A protein has these predicted regions:
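Helix-to-loop junction immediately C-terminal to a conserved catalytic motif
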Residues: 101
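Short beta-strand immediately N-terminal to the Walker A/P-loop
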Residues: 83-84, 132
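Cytosolic ends of transmembrane helices, especially the final helix of ABC transmembrane type-1 domains
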Residues: 6-30
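Short, small-residue-biased leader/transition segments that mark boundaries at the very start
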Residues: 1-5, 141
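Conserved ABC transporter NBD signature motif
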Residues: 109-116, 126
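The feature captures the beta-strand-to-loop junction immediately N-terminal to the Walker
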Residues: 86-88
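ABC-family ATPase nucleotide-binding domain "signature/switch" substructure
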Residues: 130-131, 136, 144-147, 163-167, ...
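Primarily ABC-family ATPase nucleotide-binding module
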Residues: 31-83, 162, 235-236
Length: 267
């Protein structure tokens, strides 16, 4: 019994140390990041039109003492093309997507959008032409309309409805107690995981992005909803970068990039 107790305590201690290590990795990601430089705001890309995206010799590591998540990675995405990033867990798919959309700064290399270095035009301006739907994204306490528009003053009601239709959730919204003014969140109506994902997609589309980044953004949807959304977004001719595991999601892309095939270049 004593040996069993000691073994159990050692396992608990190991798990605590492992969790502390993970927290330290995330903290170092913040500490070692340089402050962003903002330039005067301007829309760099045309609304709802595809942008050419080039990744040149891209490398990323959490801090100077850790192994690179990926190194010397190169990729070219044509305007309006959809790319699926695939590979086993831990290969760097989400990290690569976050670097491409400007949420993480690369250790080295370049992200070029329509022949413009995203850091030279200013990340604030780059983000004006992009939208992201990430796994950790959430909705906020407020109306459905507010959540789709990002709580924008003088929101475009017609655009809100259009984005909801493209996200295949308009009909469900109209069946709710107050339609688009239905409150959700802590004090409002509870919604399903699939409804949440579709509202997050609608919120991204409201930004009229030229590039749309999606990380497992349709993982809770049935095939019918997923197919309808993919077809609707494809009709916009915007550039899409998708991280996915589901075969149906991967099959919707124009091209598949398997990061595990890059060996040390994307591991």
């Amino acid at each position: 019994p004593y040996t069993t107790l000691v073994r159990s305590n050692l396992i608990d201690l190991f798990m605590q140390l492992r969790m502390l290590s993970l927290h330290n990795e995330r903290l170092s990601e913040i500490v070692f990041s340089e402050p962003e430089k903002e330039l005067p705001a301007r829309r760099v890309f045309d609304e709802n039109s595809g942008v050419k995206l080039e990744i040149k010799n891209l490398s990323y590591q959490y801090d100077p003492f850790s192994q690179p998540i990926f190194s010397n990675f190169n990729l070219q995405v044509e305007p309006g093309e959809s790319i699926a990033l695939v590979g086993p867990s831990g290969v760097g798919k989400t990290t690569l997507l976050k670097v491409m959309c400007g949420l993480l700064s690369p250790t080295s290399g370049e992200v070029i959008a329509d022949n413009l270095d995203i850091y030279k035009i200013g990340l604030n301006n780059y983000r004006l032409g992009t939208a992201c739907v990430l796994q950790e994204d959430r909705l906020f306490s407020g109306s459905i309309s507010d959540n789709i528009s990002g709580f924008e003053d003088n929101a475009d009601e017609e655009l809100i409805v259009e984005c909801a239709r493209r996200s295949n959730i308009h009909d469900e919204i109209m069946k709710m107690p107050m339609g688009y003014e239905t409150m959700i969140g802590e004090l409002g109506l509870g919604i399903s995981g699939g409804q949440k994902q579709r509202l997050l997609i609608a919120r991204a589309l409201y930004r009229k992005p030229s590039i749309l980044f999606m990380d497992e953004a349709t993982s809770h949807l049935d095939l019918k909803n997923e197919s309808a959304i993919n077809q609707s977004i494809a009709s916009l001719s915007i550039t899409r970068i998708i991280v996915a595991h589901r075969p149906s999601t991967i099959a919707s892309a124009d091209r598949i990039i398997d990061l595990s095939q890059y060996g040390k270049q994307a591991s």
